[in-house]
Amino acid sequence: QRRRQRQMCIRDSTKIVQKFKNRKFHITPFVSDCGLSYGAAAFGASLWHDVKVPSNLAFLGRRYLTPLEIREENLDLKKVAQYLEDGKIVAWYRGRSEFGPRALGNRSILMSPKYKENKDILNEKVKHREEWRPFAGVILKDHLQDYFEEGIESPYMLYSQTVKEDKRDKIPAITHVDNTCRIQTVESGFLSLLLEEYYKISGVPVLLNTSFNDNGKPIVETPQDAIDSFLNMNIDYLVMNNTIIGKN
């Protein structure tokens, strides 16, 4: 209001974004109590400076060195994509951790969305949670309009969007009973490259994306957290930065 900008800064639903299509929306990825610290910092900064939102806003965790016993190499994304197409469960650990409640591709568990039973497998054998709970997805941004009615770009996975009728049988593992899905859009980075490889193999530019943790436990933070969780959960592969780790 001070600068007479016709913009809104809110935390609200997909319907509001659709209704006010001519307005610009800034919804932070911190849609839980942890957002209070960001709000206080942003407000304080605005009193003395012009606030510039950094591009890596969602990834404010520490950066860790890979354990010395793990040898870094060039990551074979084609191999990882084939694992996913074969129905394997892949834990994905890269860079700085997410700040907020959503797994956005740095501390994620990934699986193919093509098979309805994958939802039950993850709920029962991996996450150990109620069978009715849905899973989110991640999609290449260029294909968003092909799969979702609203087609709202969402790099922070903030909106539940309606899966188009002709696509519901292609991604049943992430299509909820009301035909919606909370979807994340990506257009760059390693997760985007993995999606491109998966799309070449499967014809589907979407993956199931859920947080890398067991039920009742926090999302993994350190490399040691990731290794411990990988060994104690029913996960087939751990991709840690540029290294693929399997189980004997």
Give, region by region, the residue ranges found by the protein language model.
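Flexible beta->alpha loop and helix N-cap segments adjacent to enzyme active/binding sites
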Residues: R11-N248
